[in-house]
């Protein structure tokens, strides 16, 4: 079965564990997800079955929208609610100061990814090294905060809604926010609300063509050439400029790349659900 939909991952389990539940629920063997959610996080998880997993890299998943609650005065090496090491009774802040800091953190921000993350360090996930107590450093990266809004402040908990670029770490955003406040902080909760046009709709199967970030092209030649995986000629295409294109037919889809007047199959004959 080929399908794509948004699932609502609950807090308290890994994305892989949750995917296993979905595979058993729908009786499928091949499945995957795009964009890992940490175990403590909940919300939007894009899931695909069958050959649709091959389209993950072509999905339009930006911006990502999160609702995050920052715990002022709490310390955790993993910057979440699973490894709290200390809780300090810190002074309540006025909303004007919090709004000023929120406003400062709009745009592109340099940050260091959390050590408890899925980043690779010499082929090993960073969180595995962190859990084993190994010393290592991660390189600074850039994330972009498009929009932010304070939803609630009930001291010591500050809840914000953030619209961010793909690859952003909300735990790192919280750490920077805490540095500007002058408090140790951690996240007490994190919910991913949406990714681009993807949002939770009771696991409704979606038309994948509406979510692809690639332009459609038209092939005027014999469709059997595509079905048989034969060499295609550039003059048989409506658009002949270099790029990656979707060929969309009633029962299947293909993705091709035009490069130097040569046509290469990136994906071919993916059946529609």
Swiss-Prot record:
Listed EC numbers: 5.4.99.25
Statement: the UniProt record of this protein carries the keyword Isomerase: yes
GO molecular function annotation: RNA binding; tRNA pseudouridine(55) synthase activity
Keywords: Isomerase, tRNA processing
Chemical reaction(s) catalysed: uridine(55) in tRNA = pseudouridine(55) in tRNA
Cited function: Responsible for synthesis of pseudouridine from uracil-55 in the psi GC loop of transfer RNAs.
NCBIfam families cross-referenced by the UniProt entry: TruB
Name by which UniProt lists this protein: tRNA pseudouridine synthase B
Gene designation: truB
